[in-house]
C-alpha cells in the first residue's frame, strides 16, 4: 500500500512539473496585450495623471505630487477665513437628547 502511494506521488509530481513547463502554466508571466488595446488606456489620462498613477503603484518617497487638488477644500477655507464666518458655524450643533431610542 505504501509503495502504491509513493509511486502515485512520484508520478503526480512528474506530471505537474511537465505541465508547469509546458504552455499550460505561465508561472506568473503575462501575455502581451495587442498594441491597439494597450494604447487605448493611455489616451484617457493626461501626462500628469499617468505620472501620479505610476508613482502611486511603484511607490515614491515624495508624496506631494500624489495629493489631489480639491476645489471644495479651497471654498471651505475661503468661507472659514471670511469675517462673517466663525469657527463655530462649521460645526454641527448637537440635537437635544430626549432619551427617545
From Swiss-Prot:
Propeptide: 31-101
Positions where Asparagine amide occurs in the chain: 27
This protein's UniProt keywords: Amidation, Neuropeptide, Secreted, Signal
Signal sequence, renumbered to the chain: 1-16
Alphabetized InterPro entries for the sequence: Procorazonin
GO cellular component: extracellular region
Cellular localisation: Secreted
GO biological process, one term: positive regulation of heart contraction
Any one GO MF annotation of this record: corazonin receptor binding
Organs and tissues of expression: Expressed in central brain and the retrocerebral complex but not in antennal lobes, optic lobes or in gnathal, thoracic and abdominal ganglia (at protein level).
Function: Cardioactive peptide. Corazonin is probably involved in the physiological regulation of the heart beat.
Family of the protein in this entry: Belongs to the corazonin family.
Protein name in the entry: Pro-corazonin
Amino acid at each position: 500500500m505504501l509503495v502504491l502511494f509513493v509511486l502515485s506521488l512520484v508520478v503526480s509530481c512528474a506530471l505537474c512539473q511537465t505541465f508547469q513547463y509546458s504552455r499550460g502554466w505561465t508561472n506568473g508571466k503575462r501575455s502581451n496585450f495587442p498594441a491597439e488595446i494597450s494604447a487605448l488606456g493611455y489616451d484617457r489620462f493626461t501626462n500628469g495623471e499617468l505620472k501620479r498613477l505610476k508613482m502611486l503603484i511603484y511607490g515614491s518617497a515624495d508624496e506631494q505630487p500624489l495629493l489631489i487638488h480639491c476645489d471644495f477644500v479651497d471654498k471651505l477655507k475661503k468661507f472659514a477665513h471670511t469675517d462673517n464666518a466663525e469657527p463655530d458655524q462649521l460645526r454641527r450643533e448637537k440635537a437635544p437628547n430626549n432619551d427617545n431610542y
